[in-house]
A protein has these predicted regions:
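Structural alpha/beta surface segment adjacent to cysteine/selenocysteine redox centers
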Residues: 1-75
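C-terminal cap of thioredoxin/glutaredoxin-like
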Residues: 1-6, 71-151
Length: 151
């Protein structure tokens, strides 16, 4: 759906990814770190790694921490696996994840816990100029985008 939005609004929409690793997803922080490390390789590395890990999240979620699914995915994506391993050792990636987490947490109560008002939160979260669309359909997003463009 994000690709559809970017196609329809190529000059009006910018997608920004932020890490918000939930405690219930034991590999979430590591997945975010792999995406940030992949970003250093250019060629839209963050998005490619993020989407590959997210598309395979059920497998990824159940893995032990020492398994190498992200490295396998990186190789399939044509990334330099040795460089990815080196970049994963950089503490700056952990710092960035912490900063993004704290930034999103500061948005309010909905980000403070995984359950808010009895409703389980879902990630990823989407905001359009600070507004969260009701629903995750192309039409729901387009409605908010159109409203924002009129402002």
């Amino acid at each position: 759906m994000i690709e559809q939005i970017l196609e329809k609004y190529p000059n009006d929409v910018k997608v920004v990814f932020k890490n918000f690793p939930l405690g219930s997803h034991k590999q979430a922080r590591k997945a975010g770190k792999y995406a940030l490390a992949a970003d250093r390789q250019g060629d839209n590395g963050f998005k490619k790694m993020f989407m590959a890990l997210f598309d395979d999240k059920d497998t990824w979620r159940g893995l032990r921490s020492d398994e190498d699914l992200p490295l396998k995915l990186a190789a399939e994506l044509g990334m330099n696996v040795d460089q990815l391993k080196r970049d994963m050792q950089d503490p700056a990636l952990d710092t960035q994840i912490d900063q993004e987490y704290n930034q999103l947490k500061s948005l309010g109560n909905a980000y403070e816990t995984e359950n808010f008002a009895g409703v389980r939160l879902a990630v990823p979260k989407f905001f359009i100029n600070g507004r969260e669309p009701v629903g995750r359909s192309f039409d729901a997003f387009s409605k908010v985008i159109e409203e924002e463009l009129k402002k």
